[in-house]
Every structure is written in structure tokens, then in C-alpha cells.
Amino acid sequence: LALSGPYRLGFRAPVSCVPINTMIFNKPRITAVLGPTNTGKTHFAMDRMLAHSSGMIGFPLRLLARENYDRAVAAKGAGKVALITGEEKIVPAGARYFLCTAEAMPVDRAVEFVGIDEIQMCADPERGHVFTDRLLNARGGGETMFMGADTIRPLIRLLVPGVEFISRPRFSVLSYSGERKIIRMPPKSVVVAFSAGDVYAIAEMVRRHRGGAAVVMGALSPRTRNAQVAMYQAGEVEHLVATDAIGMGLNMDVDHVAFAALRKFDGHRQ
């Protein structure tokens, strides 16, 4: 640009310009959708992503990425949807939608929508650096969405200027049913245990007394894990035994939740 008089403006050479209405009025939207479990946050984010021409969501669990990959494939077709986790990588040449674990997100790829699920994992001692990096740096060209617990609200407000908060109420009502023996649990029950040994021991007990149980935990291979979930969801067994990772948004048809213990050793302390 060159000024050739007090009020005249001229161009010395062609320059690349962004229309002012795009710069001011079409600023990419950043939202934080917060609330407890069973509020439809992930479902809402998936709908928003699929409404865009391209998108990417980072999940805390491989099984959650796989579950939503299957949903996206049903909506958009296998040729447009990619799955990227530490164990599985399905990336068609024409992929437009990417369902990933947070660590495996191809963050150098430009997409219209970016979502990060369970963003309160920023506070996790082992994985928090990944989720914090995504909070600070992962952005969609048209829309960015963070989903998680309301406890993360102050941190997001501090670190993400211009963020819009959306609160989601729980769909179901929780009630305490008291103590109950494992062998007397009703159908559509899940027992949550805090170690692989406890998961296998409880699953074997349920199988002996109730005829069958599915097992879900991260240590299983992707094929085995997916088969166990499918077996439960299809009604082939009425009980599920899992680690507490199942609480990170995995969508299961469960009416009753029981904890095998009330204290957990996280590798450092009880």
C-alpha cells in the first residue's frame, strides 16, 4: 500500500486480501459444551461435525473413537471417514472426517470442525499435556468444540479467549440402590472394577452364576474389545464387567451400575 495524498489510497502491487466481513463477522466459533455424563455432549459434537464438509474429533478412548467411527461411516460412507488410534489406522484416500484418540490426531491437517472430548483430561497427570495442547492449539476452520465436565470451565475461560459455554443437563436420573451381591444383579448391569485381575475374577463369577458376561477394558485387543461390546449390545449376555474407563462417554445400554470397590490405586496413591 502507498499513500499518494492526504486522502488517496493506492496499490503498488497486487496483494492477497481477506474480505473485511470474513475477518470480522465470520470468526471461527469456539464452544465448550459442559455437563455430567449422559447429557449427549458427544452426540451433539458428532452432529455438528457431520454438518460440516470436513472434521476431526479427538477422544480419550480407542473404543469411543471406534464407536463414533462406525456412526460416521453409517452417515457418510466408509470412503469419507478415517479412524486413527494407537492400535488401528483406517485412512481412505478421500477421507474428510477423522475419528481419533487425542494423541493420534493428525493436527497438521486442516478441517472445518475440530472437537476434543473429555477435555477435563487436561488435569490428568499422565495425559494432561496432550489435552492441554489440544485446548490451546487444535482449531477448526469454521468451528471448534470442547466437550467435558463442568469442572474444567474456569481453565477454559482463562486460556481460550472468546469461548462460548453451553451447559447440558443430564438426560436420566440417578438413584442409589444400596449394596447387592454380584450374583443377584439385575439384567443390563455393569460391574466396574479397578484392575484387570478383578475384572476377570468378577466376570468368571458372573458367568458361573448368571450364564455369561462381557468384558471391556483397554488391555484387550481391538478385535476382542469390539466383539465383547457387540455381544453385550446385541443382548447375547446381560452383564458387563469393565474398568472405570467405561465412564468416559462410552454409550452402553445399562440400567444398573455397581462398583466392586470404592477406592482406586492410580499408580501413585489410593
Task: Please state what every model-predicted region is.
Residues 42, 102-110, 135, 240-258:
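SF2 helicase motor core recognition
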Residues 54-65, 145-146, 185-206, 213-216:
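Conserved strand-helix element at the start of the C-terminal RecA-like helicase core
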Residues 73-110:
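Inter-Walker segment of RecA-like/P-loop motor cores
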Residues 87-98, 223-239:
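Conserved motor-coupling elements within RecA-like helicase/translocase cores
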Residues 108-110, 120-132, 250-253, 269:
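Conserved ATPase-coupling elements of RecA-like P-loop NTPase cores
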Residues 117-119, 261:
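Walker B catalytic acidic pair
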Residues 121-173:
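Post-DEXD/H (motif II) to motif III coupling segment of the RecA-like Helicase ATP-binding lobe
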Residues 218-219, 234-238, 244-270:
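Conserved RecA-like helicase motor core of SF1/SF2 enzymes
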